[in-house]
Amino acid sequence: MQIFVKTLTGKTITLEVESSDTIDNVKAKIQDKEGIPPDQQRLIFAGKQLEDGRTLADYNIQKESTLHLVLRLRGGAKKRKKKTYTKPKKQKHKHKKVKLAVLQFYKVDDSTGKVTRLRKECPNADCGAGTFMANHFDRHYCGKCGLTYVYNQKA
């Protein structure tokens, strides 16, 4: 029987085969006509790749069927080397969650029940209300805008 093999270039080859022929035999015939080694050939029929040991009858290939020939690609991308680090990884800072942390900014007077601020609020308009200044040993400092008040030094 006669089958057709269509190559990637669009060229169609006709082969004289029997339904009992193996895929290996078909690839050998393609090598005789085209010079492509069988290990580089991949034959596709009805969307399936044909395995070498099977026969044409296994795939229900009848007379005047068309097989598609594609070339096998070898290799792929180069393997990348794994990076080796000289120093150990830096530990990330963990945020310390303090429950009821707001209580350290205010004090409630027991006798009068009056609330007083323990920290100084930043007067800058950019910071807004509720932005407290850090209390250092010699100054008050706003971390948001950088405003600093230095205490009077007694000589």
UniProtKB/Swiss-Prot annotation:
Cross-link Glycyl lysine isopeptide (Lys-Gly) (interchain with G-Cter in ubiquitin) per UniProt, renumbered positions: K48
Domain Ubiquitin-like span(s) in chain numbering: 1-76
Keyword line: Cytoplasm, Isopeptide bond, Metal-binding, Nucleus, Ribonucleoprotein, Ribosomal protein, Ubl conjugation, Zinc, Zinc-finger
SMART domains: Ribosomal_S27, UBQ
Gene Ontology molecular function terms on file: mRNA binding; structural constituent of ribosome; zinc ion binding
Glycyl lysine isopeptide (Gly-Lys) (interchain with K-? in acceptor proteins) crosslink location in chain: G76
Keyword Glycosyltransferase assigned: no
GO-annotated biological processes: translation
GO CC, one annotated term: ribonucleoprotein complex
InterPro entries the UniProt entry points to: Ribosomal_eS31, Ribosomal_eS31_euk-type_sf, Ribosomal_zn-bd, Ubiquitin-like_dom, Ubiquitin-like_domsf, Ubiquitin_CS, Ubiquitin_dom, Ubiquitin_ubiquitin-like
SUPFAM superfamilies linked: Ubiquitin-like (SSF54236), Zn-binding ribosomal proteins (SSF57829)
Zinc finger annotations (C4-type) as residue ranges: 122-145
PANTHER family noted in UniProt: UBIQUITIN
Additional observations: Ubiquitin is generally synthesized as a polyubiquitin precursor with tandem head to tail repeats. Often, there are one to three additional amino acids after the last repeat, removed in the mature protein. Alternatively, ubiquitin extension protein is synthesized as a single copy of ubiquitin fused to a ribosomal protein (either eL40 or eS31) or to an ubiquitin-related protein (either RUB1 or RUB2). Following translation, extension protein is cleaved from ubiquitin.
Family, similarity comment: In the N-terminal section; belongs to the ubiquitin family. In the C-terminal section; belongs to the eukaryotic ribosomal protein eS31 family.
Protein name in UniProt: Ubiquitin-ribosomal protein eS31y fusion protein
The organism of origin for this protein: Hordeum vulgare (Barley)
Annotated gene: MUB2
